């Protein structure tokens, strides 16, 4: 066992003494040592009960004959970090999560690993670490937050973000605003809709790195505790059988994850995270592959922000196993950490409530929920959640209103300076430019809350999974490195054609060249982690991974 390097032999007397200081007994020195990476904290709603899940994991490890060692991992709440400088740290924290898990596991020579997390960047960071380390490992994801109702309607955190615009437009009074504040995040768990956290939990299960139903089992449920305990038992079995993630996660597994992403209309952030995770396995996922799979995969379930259905409703409909069962022909039958293949898991699917999953033969949309756009405004690509765009906005031409910061754009929107027919352009928000590629949820929520139906938004930054409407992100090359988005001016005409996958500014090559000759990069004073990150980060089309 790997852990023998810290517990066996005469020259490890001091090591054993330190382990005994923790309460490790002589007989436990012969058992597998299992690291349990716990992202519990009391600032992230999706993480505030991970201590209980981690306890269940450790009980499972003990029951199966292993010795668990828990260690802490950071976790940022994207919702609380939204709309201020803190959002610049969200995406970069993914790499910190991966690196710190790697450091802890390698330093202490754990035989196996369980990662416990719920939210946006923490899950991808943990999966990156699992594949990088390639020791027996399993993921336990915290599960979705249940919803409450306001005015008889289901509400989610998306509604709270949009409430500010509704209030500004006179659609809500003070009492109504308070209701949204009090009931849009009523429980523990990852925010209710198919935003980034729940999208990544579903893709983790599809990749085969968590047990069946782990992703959609609600945060407060006893089923979640049982899955956590089973995961603790399973990791010990994986150690005994020497089954490592890269023994079953391969290119076809990632194709399955992209397919699932398209079937459900997941967050556009998955287009950043999956390539970064795959890179740790030596696999390259191009934007072209995402678009190729999107074109051949139907969209069969509509979940908030695209509808009023929530992830707990998907769980009642059978979760990931039922999605695979209904859309079996679109998936490769790959092995999973459970010891069962995807097809075998699909046969376990149980419908417990309403069925919100359409048949692939009669889908909601013939193509997948995410589209990759290219053109002179995004030569390396841009991303849009097509599943959350109304039919009449699939093709749109509008007038550019250009802003070099989120705050500037948000103020203009709330002050009524953005009108129907406009295309809001927010630039210098990319991986290097911001840096950290912050999410632009507040401007998009303001547009929705104000009831603006014919306004698009384009950025080299990102969007929250809660964003809906014609919002195009990840524009690459970004403004900070001289991408054409840096050359757009107020009044330019911008054309969006989602079916044709086109994103164009109506300027000739000569006009762009003339503007480029006058362009100068913006200098930004950076310090600490973000200064290092800005130097090392790659473009959005490469998952904003570090060199």
Curated annotation (Swiss-Prot):
GO biological process: isoleucine biosynthetic process; L-valine biosynthetic process
EC number(s) from the headed UniProt entry: 4.2.1.9
Cofactor names: [2Fe-2S] cluster; Mg(2+)
PROSITE patterns per record: ILVD_EDD_1 (PS00886), ILVD_EDD_2 (PS00887)
Catalytic reactions of this protein: (2R)-2,3-dihydroxy-3-methylbutanoate = 3-methyl-2-oxobutanoate + H2O; (2R,3R)-2,3-dihydroxy-3-methylpentanoate = (S)-3-methyl-2-oxopentanoate + H2O
Keyword Transit peptide: no
Pathway info: Amino-acid biosynthesis; L-isoleucine biosynthesis; L-isoleucine from 2-oxobutanoate: step 3/4; Amino-acid biosynthesis; L-valine biosynthesis; L-valine from pyruvate: step 3/4
Pfam family, one: ILV_EDD_C
InterPro entries the UniProt entry points to: Dihydro-acid_dehy_C, DihydroxyA_deHydtase, DiOHA_6PGluconate_deHydtase_CS, ILV_EDD_C, ILV_EDD_N, IlvD/EDD_N
Gene Ontology molecular function: 2 iron, 2 sulfur cluster binding; dihydroxy-acid dehydratase activity; magnesium ion binding
PTM annotation (N6-carboxylysine): residues: 121
Binding residue positions for Mg(2+): 78, 120-121, 439
Textual note on the cofactor: Binds 1 [2Fe-2S] cluster per subunit. This cluster acts as a Lewis acid cofactor.
Keywords: 2Fe-2S, Amino-acid biosynthesis, Branched-chain amino acid biosynthesis, Iron, Iron-sulfur, Lyase, Magnesium, Metal-binding
Family assignment from sequence similarity: Belongs to the IlvD/Edd family.
Function comment: Functions in the biosynthesis of branched-chain amino acids. Catalyzes the dehydration of (2R,3R)-2,3-dihydroxy-3-methylpentanoate (2,3-dihydroxy-3-methylvalerate) into 2-oxo-3-methylpentanoate (2-oxo-3-methylvalerate) and of (2R)-2,3-dihydroxy-3-methylbutanoate (2,3-dihydroxyisovalerate) into 2-oxo-3-methylbutanoate (2-oxoisovalerate), the penultimate precursor to L-isoleucine and L-valine, respectively.
Protein name (database record): Dihydroxy-acid dehydratase
Biological source species: Archaeoglobus fulgidus (strain ATCC 49558 / DSM 4304 / JCM 9628 / NBRC 100126 / VC-16)
């Amino acid at each position: 066992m790997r852990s023998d390097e810290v517990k066996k032999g005469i020259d490890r007397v001091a090591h054993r003494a330190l382990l005994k200081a923790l309460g490790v007994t002589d007989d436990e020195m012969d058992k597998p040592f299992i690291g349990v990476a716990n992202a519990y904290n009391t600032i992230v709603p999706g993480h505030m009960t991970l201590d209980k899940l981690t306890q269940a994991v450790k009980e499972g490890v003990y029951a199966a004959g292993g010795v668990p060692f828990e260690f802490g991992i950071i976790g940022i709440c994207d919702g609380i970090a939204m709309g201020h400088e803190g959002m610049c740290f969200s995406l970069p924290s993914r790499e910190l999560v991966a690196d710190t898990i790697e450091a802890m596991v390698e330093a202490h020579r754990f035989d196996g690993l369980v990662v416990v997390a719920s939210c946006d960047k923490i899950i991808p960071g943990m999966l990156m670490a699992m594949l990088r380390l390639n020791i027996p490992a399993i993921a336990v994801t915290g599960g979705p937050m249940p919803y409450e109702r306001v005015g008889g309607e289901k509400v989610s955190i998306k509604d709270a973000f949009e409430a500010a615009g509704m209030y500004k437009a006179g659609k809500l009074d003070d009492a109504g605003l308070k209701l949204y504040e009090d009931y849009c995040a009523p429980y523990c768990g990852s925010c209710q809709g198919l935003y980034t956290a729940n999208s990544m939990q579903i893709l983790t299960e599809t990749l085969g790195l968590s047990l069946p139903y782990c992703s959609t089992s609600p945060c407060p449920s006893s089923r979640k505790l049982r899955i956590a305990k089973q995961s603790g038992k399973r990791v010990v079995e994986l150690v005994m059988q020497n089954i490592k993630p890269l023994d079953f996660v391969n290119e076809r597994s990632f194709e399955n994850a992209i397919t699932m992403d398209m079937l459900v209309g997941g967050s556009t952030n998955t287009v950043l995270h999956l390539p970064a995770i795959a890179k740790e396995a030596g696999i390259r996922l191009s934007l072209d592959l995402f678009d190729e799979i999107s074109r051949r995969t139907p969209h069969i379930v509509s979940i908030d922000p695209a509808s009023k259905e929530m992830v707990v409703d998907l769980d009642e409909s059978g979760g990931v196993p039922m999605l695979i069962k209904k859309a079996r022909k679109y998936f490769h039958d790959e092995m999973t950490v459970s010891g069962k293949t995807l097809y075998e898991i699909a046969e376990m699917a149980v419908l417990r409530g309403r069925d919100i999953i359409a048949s692939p033969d009669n889908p909601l949309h013939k193509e997948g929920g995410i589209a990759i756009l290219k053109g002179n405004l995004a030569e390396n690509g841009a991303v849009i959640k097509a599943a959350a765009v109304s039919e009449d906005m699939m093709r749109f031409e509008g007038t550019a209103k250009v802003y070099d910061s989120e705050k500037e754009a948000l103020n203009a929107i709330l002050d009524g300076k953005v009108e129907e027919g406009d295309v809001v352009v927010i630039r210098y928000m990319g991986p290097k430019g911001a840096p950290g590629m912050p999410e632009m949820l507040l401007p998009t929520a303001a547009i929705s809350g104000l009831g603006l139906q014919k306004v698009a938004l384009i950025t080299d930054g990102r969007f929250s999974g809660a964003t809906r409407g014609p919002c195009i992100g990840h524009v690459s090359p970004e403004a900070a490195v001289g991408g054409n988005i840096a050359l757009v001016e107020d009044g330019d005409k911008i054309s969006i054609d989602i079916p044709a996958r086109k994103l164009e500014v109506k300027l000739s090559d000569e006009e762009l060249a003339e503007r480029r000759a006058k362009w100068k990069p913006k200098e930004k004073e950076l310090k600490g982690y973000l200064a290092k990150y800005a130097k090392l980060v790659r473009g959005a089309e490469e998952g904003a991974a570090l060199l």
